[in-house]
Design a protein with these regions (language model features):
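Loop-helix junctions at membrane interfaces
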Residues: 1-180
């Protein structure tokens, strides 16, 4: 089997080089903007991560959206600019909004998926992370839901504005075609 330009091969099939490069650029952009955070309660609220979750979901699909969220969380933790709470929120939000967008092709559904995935499901999954991995026995089950909701609503709103502009100017479809 020959390797075509723009593709890499692994034991499961092909990985698209363009998607990998775009995902890496999204990670770099997200990490470089990690200084923009809003402390709310016990969590670092980071709207840029949620904005990039939505953008990665729309452009890259579920696998690369989740990988982008994971790699961003790892790098931010290594740099000391993130916390372990970033993993459940960002990855679940990226997965849910990407799966919903993949099935429906509706942007509004993607936005709702990010808010539910990060704000509610990710907020609830942050509780065992805080309790078991961070040793914080004082947190309650719903401690992280409100801060995560605030953060994801802000990031999703920014993404909706950017994607809306790209959609109206036909840039969205053009960029999607370039990545495929």
């Amino acid at each position: 089997m020959a390797i075509k330009k723009g593709e890499l091969m692994n034991n499961r099939g092909k990985l698209e080089l363009k998607k990998m490069v775009v995902a890496a650029m999204f990670v770099a952009l997200t990490v470089s903007l990690s200084g923009f955070s809003i402390p709310v309660g016990t969590a670092k609220c980071f709207p840029v991560q949620h904005m990039m979750n939505v953008i990665a979901a729309v452009f890259l699909g579920p696998v690369y959206a989740v990988l982008s969220a994971f790699v961003t969380s790892v790098i931010r933790n290594i740099m000391g600019t993130g916390s372990l709470l970033a993993f459940p929120g960002s990855m679940v939000g990226a997965l849910l909004c990407a799966l919903i967008y993949q099935k429906s092709k509706k942007l509004w559904a993607c936005y709702i998926g990010e808010i539910i995935g990060t704000g509610i499901i990710g907020g609830l999954l942050a509780y065992p992370v805080a309790l078991l991995l961070m040793g914080n026995a004082k947190v309650a089950t719903f401690t992280f839901v409100l801060p995560f909701l605030i953060s994801t609503c802000g990031g999703t709103l920014i993404a909706a504005i950017l994607i809306g502009i790209m959609d109206k100017t036909k840039v969205l479809d053009y960029l999607k075609r370039q990545i495929r």
